[in-house]
Amino acid sequence: MRSHTATMVDRIEDTSRADREAALADAGHNVFELASDDVAVDLLTDSGTGTMSNDQWAAMLQGDEAYAGSASFEDLAVAAEDVMGFQHIIPAHQGRGAENVLYGAVLSAGDTVLNNAHFDTTRAHVAANDATPVDCPVDGARDPDTDAPFKGNFSVERARRVVDDVGADAVPVVVLTITNNSMAGQPVSIENTREVAAFADDIDATFVIDACRFAENAHFVQQREPGYEHDSVAAIAREQLSYADACVMSGKKDGLVNVGGFVGLHDDGRLHEQCRQRGILYEGFSTYGGMSGRDMAAFAVGLREAVEPPYVAERVAQVQRLADALTDRDVPIYQPAGGHAVYIDANAALPHLPREQFPGQAFVCELYREGGVRAVELGRFAFPDTDRRDLVRLALPRRTYGPDHLDHVADTAAAVCERGTDVTGLEIVSEPELTELRHFSAALQPVA
């Protein structure tokens, strides 16, 4: 039984297949351009799309909208320290704002940034600072059929080879993303976190944890890592984050809110002051950072709710339920399932399409055409010039959809797979200059 009830509902508009085909064509076969009213089940992202609790809504009514010295900011700062262990935060309007604040302070042209796997905005921020993003996944991370408990881990061995090549002075930042969104939402172990921290210390680099899904990662540690089975999710999260010098946090994930983020730091030294000044310049004064007081109030409550055992266990179980439903219908997926999403293996589902015709994006379009399901491609289209598989992410908004919605998604995906060779590939018609973010706004068309 779910640990919560619904006190407000949102109507799903009914659309015909003809309606969806017309909408898809108007959108340039890019589902980011679809109107939400034209979508039946929206699994584009879990970022800021979830359902807030009544306690969060109650906190919003008491939000302090003061420009400086907001009591709501103080509530958020206390929650960040209590839950995540960071004594100092620089608020931002969302995670990518926090990335801009932090990476702009620590990167210079010609630098190299090591990460277990850069996600799209992180990769773009690194590139925007004329630095080079390098992924260091462990062996087997890219194999959708390999069964391992922590496929999101960071390969220190691979990272050392990069340092040997470019020099330690060229690597000012080492990033660990938990969970590893680009590698199908796979978790990272505490043991690996310690290893990465020691490696960063060895090369005198700032160790940053991208903590957007820290609570989901802590749940996996509790379930899979020996020695942590009796520890609480809250205690595990605090330990894992304690090894980092800084964190980037998006409240739109494990903050359980619709907007907001921050840079977290353990001390108030030079990096803190640099980030504070950049925050004021780009995000707003250091006690709001682009958030309203009511948003900060809800964020403070959401951080505490994210590590509550019933919530996080139910969250991960719902993702597993969707994975099981897809597997039961012979839809090829990345195994094991992650904590926030299920990833369909489009290369296996549509083997007749060459990678140049974007099988992942083709599958995304067919999901929408077939059943009004919006997903996102995370493969050659989203990450050009990489060797990542063509995956289709089905990201579940938190506390939002029920079993019947998941069954509809699974049935729709199965119907796409059954059509097989009838699915046509795509080609790009136009794309932005910053190709790291092309999947947000590029236009495509079916291959003739």
UniProtKB/Swiss-Prot annotation:
Q: Which reaction does it catalyse?
A: L-tryptophan + H2O = indole + pyruvate + NH4(+)
Q: Does the keyword Protease apply?
A: no
Q: Name the enzyme group at the top EC level.
A: lyase
Names of the cofactor(s): pyridoxal 5'-phosphate
PROSITE patterns, per database record: BETA_ELIM_LYASE
Instruction: Note the superkingdom of the native organism.
Output: Archaea
Report the EC number(s), separated by commas if there are several: 4.1.99.1
| Entries under InterPro entries matching the protein | ArAA_b-elim_lyase/Thr_aldolase, Beta-eliminating_lyase, PyrdxlP-dep_Trfase, PyrdxlP-dep_Trfase_major, PyrdxlP-dep_Trfase_small, TNase, Tryptophanase_CS
UniProt cross-references to SUPFAM superfamilies, sorted A to Z? PLP-dependent transferases (SSF53383)
User: Which CDD domains does this UniProt record tie to the protein?
Assistant: Tnase_like (cd00617)
Q: Any idea which residues bear N6-(pyridoxal phosphate)lysine here?
A: K253
Signal sequence, renumbered to the chain: none
An annotated Gene Ontology molecular function = lyase activity
Protein name, as recorded: Probable tryptophanase
